[in-house]
Each structure stands twice: as C-alpha cells, then as structure tokens.
C-alpha cells in the first residue's frame, strides 16, 4: 500500500533525491569529528576559537550572500553565520545557493566547522567555514516559535501526541529534555549515596515463577521451552532477601517492575523502583537513612531541599515527621480503630462512606480508610509508621505490639513515595502469613500474595536481622521536577496501541513458532 505523504513530505523527498543527484549523500556513514557542545561554547565563550559542531538546523534567515541559522545539539542552541564565499571558496557556489538555501530543511542534521565570534548585539555565534550534510529529515518537525517577548506560538503540547512521539517532544520542548536529564541525575545521586556506604548493586530476575514481594496483579507470559507460565516481576524483594541469606550485608537494585493494574497520573503498568536491604538494621534506622538520602539527592540535583510541587512547597530537609497509621486515622476521622475486628472495620468504612467489597480483609479495609481519609493530608515528607499486621505479610511484628508491624511508608504531597520494613526473618511466621494470603485469594482478592516455597526454604537456612526499603523512581522524579503526571517522567509511557492504516504487517506474522 502506498504511503500517504503531505505536501511538505513530498518536497523533502524531492530535496533528498536532488542532494544525491549533485553528489551529496544525505545519510553519510563517515565519522564527523565533533569537538564542542553549544552549551559550553556559550557559557565559557572565547572569541576566535576554532570549533566543530553538529546538530539540527533550527530556523534559518537567508539574506543574499550571507545567512544566519540556529544549530541545536544535545545541550542547546547556538547561532551560526554562513557566508557564501566562505563555504564556497571557488567558483562553484552549489553548496550555498542550492544545498543550504534550497535543499536543507528545518530539522536536518548538519555539521559545521568554524570560528566563534560575537555579533554586534553581543550574541555568541559561529562563523562557518565548512558545512556538511549529516542526515536529511523527510518529515517536518512542529514549527514552535518564541517571539521577542518570550511568548510561545504553535507549541507541541497535545499530551497524547507528545507521549506517542517523545522523540519529537524532546526536540521541540527543551523543558522535557531537562526533566529526563534530572531523572538520570536523581538515579546517579542515589546510586552514589548507596555505593558510598559500601552496598552492592545487583540484578535479579524479571521473569519469575512466583510473583512475590508486593500485593499486586501480575502480567503472565509463557516459556515455550520449559512449557511453564512465568510472571513479570511485581517486585524484586524476595530475590534480594535471598542474597541477604547468601551472605551480603547490603544490596540494592534499580528494577523495572510490572503490575497489571489501572493507569492514572501516578501509576504506569511498567515502572522503576529502587529496593535496598541492609543487615543488622531496623525500620527506625531505615527512616533516618531514607531522609538523609533524599536530602542528599535534592542538594545534588537541585541545589536546594525546597521543591515546588503544584501549589505546594515541599521541603526535603531531614528529619521528617513521624506519625503512626492508627494515629493518622484517628487524627483525620476521630475514630480509634486500634483492636477492631473485620466486622467493626466494615462499620467504620460504612460510616465514613469508604467504598469496600467482600473480598477485603482487615488489612485492605484499614488501607482503604487511610487512603480515602488520610493520605492526601500529608504534604510535607511524613513517615506513616506501625501498620497493622494484616497489611504487611513480609514485615516483622512490632517489638511492643504484636498486632502491628515495624513498617513505614513515606508520604509526600499526599502520595506514597517509599515503603520499608524491619524484615520478617522467622520462616515459621512467614509461612503462616503466606497461608493467610491464600485465604484472601480464595475470597477473591486478586492482589493477595502467592506462597513462594523457595523463599521460605531460603529463610529456613537463616536470614540475619535486616531492614529493607523500596522507593519509586518515577514518583520521586515527578516530585523533584514539579510534574503532576507519571507520563511526564517516563520516556515512553504505556498507551493504547496506535491504529495504523490497513495493510500494515502484523508483527506476529514474522514470528517463528518457537517465539510466538
């Protein structure tokens, strides 16, 4: 089936063919010796410096024998000045008259060699002595323009288009690129903090025979050679604990996790988390470590602990506030749920108009009350501690109250950011907790945990006292970049598949029997 081209796309393909006709390959294979970035040239400007730059040509002002254009590389933009007789020293002026003026388009990649100078108005620029075509774009970019007053016109702002075509979004919206650069810096800072304490970065399986470590619905796939079902991991917790059993004192992992659940502004089916486990520590130590780590990250990435999140200013300066879960519910509802059974909790939910269903046990009911009535009130970083034991099947019972657990969740701007335990290391207690989860599954709770027999076997060999913590990288990036949607901090967020023209090949048709 013929591809439907716009008028601009047709013209660009004609230009591409014209380049080849005059002996210029629009997609050359040879290395181009870039030695400078535009950002550095402008921030550390030295007049008369010889430079080699490459990037997209963005904007062009043709003025007879001389022209100005903007060159955009990975670090920013700089003005370039092109004189016909400078780049065409002989009688043949094709490179300027035909290639630069007629056959190059907005968005094409070019390479230039030249010398830095300041224009009469003081703008850092590059006087071009050599021009090379590096890559021809056959599809036009959105023409986003900014006027002298800083107003943006024809902006590329439609969220669905931006998320589907992130490659375009990154080119024309500099703030988007800045968000992802900060995301990378956040992860680097976190990694440096943890390795600086001597902890080992590890990798654990993504495909797992038992989806454990969290209460969530998994994605299921099938391994043909083994003829068995496998699950995309919902968490990496149980494998990291196996490594603690194996003798490591501190491990951490930046892990992709997958949960087959709904999507909204704070949830994507595929997301990134960091989990860490350290021996001979408890959840109180982990609270201190978590707040120290977040304060360090803020200073490394932003230079301040104060962050604007929507209308709120949030301060990540340690120490953070501590509030028990039962205390939080009492503070915001006036009801003390301590010691209540399931029937009493259902009455509380009815009174507070918290929606619940018959599949929910005590833990889920308490979680729903907290989520509906309390969570959104915690704007400043706050550790919610001491969760009821029914909510935390992998967590050690509280040393002072066996009905509670040594667990905290860190709330920021009304959302959970991190979750941590004094880890349960009693294999007999752990088996009983898993069996309670099976009962919940029998009642219809599709987020109840599976029994992982191999993990129980590992615990039976002995696991030292350990504290573990997991933190959502996507959500942390949202907070530190001031974004209110997780789609803004994931390069390619999950979306409904795009409908292409009929006649497009079915990807499954190209799979062998063993790969379907």
Residue ranges and their predicted role:
Residues 1-516:
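Class II aminoacyl-tRNA synthetase catalytic cores and aaRS-like
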């Amino acid at each position: 089936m013929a591809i439907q081209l716009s008028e601009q796309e047709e013209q660009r393909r004609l230009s591409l063919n014209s380049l080849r006709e005059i002996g210029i390959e629009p997609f050359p294979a040879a290395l181009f010796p870039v030695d400078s970035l535009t950002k550095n040239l402008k921030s550390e400007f030295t007049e008369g410096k010889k430079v080699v730059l490459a990037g997209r040509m963005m904007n062009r002002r043709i003025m007879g024998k001389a022209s100005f254009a903007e060159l955009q590389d990975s670090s920013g933009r700089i003005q370039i000045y092109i004189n016909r007789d400078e780049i065409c020293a002989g009688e043949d002026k094709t490179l300027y008259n035909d290639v630069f003026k007629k056959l190059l388009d907005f968005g094409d990649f070019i390479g230039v060699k030249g010398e830095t100078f300041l224009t009469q108005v003081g703008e850092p620029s590059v006087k071009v002595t050599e021009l090379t075509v590096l890559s021809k774009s056959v599809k036009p970019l959105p023409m986003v323009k900014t006027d002298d007053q800083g107003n943006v016109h024809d902006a590329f702002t439609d969220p669905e288009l931006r998320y589907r075509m992130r490659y375009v979004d990154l080119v024309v919206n500099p703030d988007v690129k800045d968000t992802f650069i900060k995301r990378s810096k956040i992860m680097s800072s976190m990694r440096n903090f943890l390795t600086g304490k001597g902890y080992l970065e590890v990798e654990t399986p993504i495909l797992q025979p038992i989806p454990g470590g969290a209460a969530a619905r998994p994605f299921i796939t099938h391994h043909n050679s083994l003829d068995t079902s496998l699950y995309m991991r919902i968490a990496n917790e149980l494998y990291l604990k196996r490594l603690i059993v194996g003798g490591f004192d501190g491990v951490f992992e930046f892990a992709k996790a997958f949960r087959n659940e709904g999507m909204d502004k704070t949830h994507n089916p595929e997301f990134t988390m960091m989990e860490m486990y350290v021996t001979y520590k408890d959840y109180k130590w982990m609270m201190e470590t978590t707040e120290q780590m977040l304060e360090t990250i803020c200073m490394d990435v932003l230079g301040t602990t104060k962050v604007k999140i929507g209308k709120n200013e949030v301060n990540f300066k340690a120490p953070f506030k501590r509030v028990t879960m039962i205390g939080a519910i009492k503070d915001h509802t006036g009801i003390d749920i301590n010691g209540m059974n399931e029937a009493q909790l259902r009455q509380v939910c009815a009174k507070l108009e918290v929606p619940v269903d018959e599949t929910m046990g005590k833990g889920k009911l308490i979680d729903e009350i907290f989520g509906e009535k309390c969570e959104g009130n915690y704007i400043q970083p706050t550790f919610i501690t001491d969760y009821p034991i029914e909510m935390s099947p992998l967590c050690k019972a509280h040393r002072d109250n066996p009905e509670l657990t040594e667990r905290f969740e860190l709330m920021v701007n009304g959302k959970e950011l991190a979750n941590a335990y004094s880890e349960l290391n009693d294999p007999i207690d752990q088996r009983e907790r898993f069996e309670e989860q099976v009962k919940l599954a029998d009642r219809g709770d599709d987020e109840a945990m599976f029994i992982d027999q191999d993990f129980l076997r590992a615990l039976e060999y002995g696991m030292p006292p350990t504290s573990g913590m997991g933190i959502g990288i996507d959500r942390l990036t949202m907070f530190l970049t001031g974004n209110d949607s997780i789609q803004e901090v994931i390069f390619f967020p999950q979306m409904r598949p795009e409908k292409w023209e009929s006649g497009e090949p079915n990807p499954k048709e190209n799979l062998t029997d063993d790969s379907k």
